[in-house]
């Protein structure tokens, strides 16, 4: 399963690197409007401001929203109810499961949970496709 991610401060990028997944794509200001994804993917995103979906992610999803299969959120618990809220919004707007949330760049346990959930999600979707 492809993992597409947006990293505002570098924390999500470090989290993805620690996961060991190779089939990844980082969306940035430079590529968010041009990139087209033609395979199912999991989106990992940070949250900005008071729980908003980053503009880069919104632009990317306008062109690639049909292939999203799940979302993972990153944030800082200091934001209280707005912690990783962008992932809640995306889950609701695109009717995909929110797989998990992690704080800052995640713990070792978070990385293991991510690997497990993405792996199981891929297996479940492959079985359904047969």
From Swiss-Prot:
Gene3D superfamilies the UniProt entry points to: 3.40.50.360
GO biological process entries: protein modification process
SUPFAM superfamilies recorded: Flavoproteins
Gene Ontology MF: a single term: FMN binding
Pfam families xref list: Flavodoxin_NdrI
Function: Probably involved in ribonucleotide reductase function.
Family of the protein in this entry: Belongs to the NrdI family.
Protein name as catalogued: Protein NrdI
Upper lineage: Bacteria, Bacillati, Bacillota, Bacilli, Bacillales
Name of the encoding gene: nrdI
């Amino acid at each position: 399963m492809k993992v597409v991610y947006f990293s505002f401060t570098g924390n999500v990028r470090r989290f993805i690197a620690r996961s060991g997944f190779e089939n990844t794509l980082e969306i940035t200001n430079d590529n968010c409007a041009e990139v087209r994804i033609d395979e199912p993917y999991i989106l990992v995103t940070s949250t900005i401001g008071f729980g908003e979906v980053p503009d880069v992610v919104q632009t990317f999803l306008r062109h690639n929203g049909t292939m999203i299969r799940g979302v993972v959120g990153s944030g800082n618990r200091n934001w209280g109810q707005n912690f990783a809220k962008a992932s809640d919004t995306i889950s609701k707007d695109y009717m995909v499961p929110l797989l998990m949330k992690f704080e800052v760049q995640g713990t070792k346990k978070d990385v293991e949970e991510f690997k497990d959930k993405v792996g199981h999600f891929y297996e479940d979707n492959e079985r359904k496709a047969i």
